[in-house]
């Protein structure tokens, strides 16, 4: 079984338990355990050398009982159907947790944009939209940025969809440049959401952010913004990593210096001679550990070595079920991904609302509304976990899936 098969299976297992605790029967689980629609497309792209290369793309729409589906599009060589399926299920949970009128969606293309020219990436982006255009739209399924996609790619996709639709459709996609209807604060919303989760977790442990020792795995979009936010709040960032290694300084790394040298793909460690391994990064003495890279990073093999008292999941699925159990038994407060990383989809929702009404908010208004939603969600999930004596992941799944299940029941789907 591949890692992505494991992600789907473990997610299904927790959803099943959550539905059982909510009193829903097997029929509801049968409906929710798989996406309602799973699209695979082939995208021919003329490369700069004149040859034509055909790429495989996916779009999953997990459940639209509540409303249109919502979720990012990632460009990565490891994208496959199972990963996209699992990610769409998590998006349903995130939307339920922060009370958004969406179901979960997700998309991806099997490619390595680091090995492509900007013109090739543009042609691929437009080709993907042409391939999925009948299945998406501002009231059907709304894409957004994800791994190795950004506001420029969203702009190309919006332009292509608008040409096909013969109507300017800014609400078709979120994460756009401000000038094309993007929202203030969207580019750093995922990281700010993680900061809010860290603040709430620290509050429960009577911990001050100022002076706290933090380790962040991943220095991409979310990881780098997160490092900067925490650095400015006075936290001591003692370890960061990227795809090539990790850096450690017990006295705290100079985050501004690293950000100045980071490339567009979040790489910085290759500029340094002295690095540590990913394994050593997770063993560092710290107060807060934030996995902000890829899935299955905290496992039963290294969960006993973690020294942090708080783990906040900024990445999707970084902790296996076995590791979750170990961390919980050790008394470590684990804030799950579906709560901690919900900032991105929340501000995407704000962008969609602003597009629909043609009235735009300041960054201060966006951040205030984001904080209000995420603090309320954290309070609800933490209180449920304490009252029922369950871990925060199961509590988050109970809150996250309840709305979709109730909407499906009222519609007569299960």
Curated annotation (Swiss-Prot):
Its EC number is 1.4.1.2. It comes from the Bacteria. This is NAD-specific glutamate dehydrogenase. The active site is at residue 106. Keywords: NAD, Oxidoreductase. NAD(+) binds at residues 190, 221. One of its GO terms (molecular function) is glutamate dehydrogenase (NAD+) activity. Signal peptide: none annotated. PROSITE patterns: GLFV_DEHYDROGENASE (PS00074). InterPro entries: Aminoacid_DH-like_N_sf, Glu/Leu/Phe/Val/Trp_DH, Glu/Leu/Phe/Val/Trp_DH_C, Glu/Leu/Phe/Val/Trp_DH_dimer, Glu/Leu/Phe/Val_DH_AS, Glu_DH, NAD(P)-bd_dom_sf, NAD_bind_Glu_DH. One of its GO terms (biological process) is glutamate catabolic process. The record marks 146 as: Important for catalysis. Substrate binds at residues 70, 94, 348. It catalyses: L-glutamate + NAD(+) + H2O = 2-oxoglutarate + NH4(+) + NADH + H(+). It comes from Staphylococcus aureus (strain COL). Belongs to the Glu/Leu/Phe/Val dehydrogenases family. The gene is gluD. Homohexamer. It is an enzyme of class 1 (oxidoreductase). The keyword NAD applies.
């Amino acid at each position: 079984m591949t890692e992505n098969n494991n992600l789907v299976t473990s997610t299904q297992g927790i959803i099943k338990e959550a539905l059982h605790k909510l009193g829903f029967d097997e029929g509801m689980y049968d409906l929710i355990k798989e996406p309602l629609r799973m699209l695979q497309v082939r995208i021919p792209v003329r490369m700069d050398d004149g040859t034509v290369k055909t790429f495989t793309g996916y779009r999953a729409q997990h459940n639209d009982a509540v409303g249109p589906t919502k979720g990012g599009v990632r460009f990565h060589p490891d994208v496959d159907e199972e990963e996209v399926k699992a990610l769409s299920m998590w998006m349903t949970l995130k939307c339920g947790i922060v009370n958004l009128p969406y179901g979960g969606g997700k998309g991806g293309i099997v490619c390595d944009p680091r090995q492509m020219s900007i013109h090739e990436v543009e042609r691929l982006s437009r080709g993907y939209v042409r391939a999925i255009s009948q299945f998406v739209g501002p009231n059907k399924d709304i894409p957004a940025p994800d791994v190795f996609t950004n506001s420029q790619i969203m702009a190309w996709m919006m332009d292509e969809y608008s040409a096909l639709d013969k109507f300017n459709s800014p609400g078709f996609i979120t994460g756009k440049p401000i000038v094309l209807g993007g929202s203030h604060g969207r580019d750093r919303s995922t990281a700010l959401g993680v900061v809010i989760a860290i603040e709430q977790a620290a509050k429960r442990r009577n911990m001050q952010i100022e002076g706290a020792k933090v380790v962040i795995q991943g220095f991409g979009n979310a990881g780098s913004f997160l490092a900067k936010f925490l650095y400015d709040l006075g936290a001591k960032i003692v370890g960061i990593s990227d795809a090539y290694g990790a850096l450690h300084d017990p006295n705290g790394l100079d985050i501004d210096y690293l950000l100045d040298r980071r490339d567009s793909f979040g790489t910085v460690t290759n500029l340094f001679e002295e690095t540590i391994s990913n394994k050593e990064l997770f063993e560092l003495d710290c107060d807060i550990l934030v996995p902000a890279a890829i899935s299955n990073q905290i496992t039963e093999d290294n969960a006993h070595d973690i020294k942090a008292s708080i783990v906040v999941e900024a990445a999707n699925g970084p902790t296996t079920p076995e590791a979750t159990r170990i961390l919980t038994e050790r008394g470590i407060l684990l804030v799950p991904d579906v709560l901690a990383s919900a900032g991105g989809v929340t501000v995407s929702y704000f962008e969609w609302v602003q597009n629909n009404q043609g009235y735009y908010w300041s960054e201060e208004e966006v951040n205030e509304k984001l904080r209000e939603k995420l603090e309320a969600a954290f309070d609800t999930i933490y209180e449920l976990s304490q009252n029922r004596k369950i871990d925060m992941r199961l509590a988050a799944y109970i809150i996250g899936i309840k709305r979709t299940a109730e909407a499906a029941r009222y519609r007569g789907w299960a």
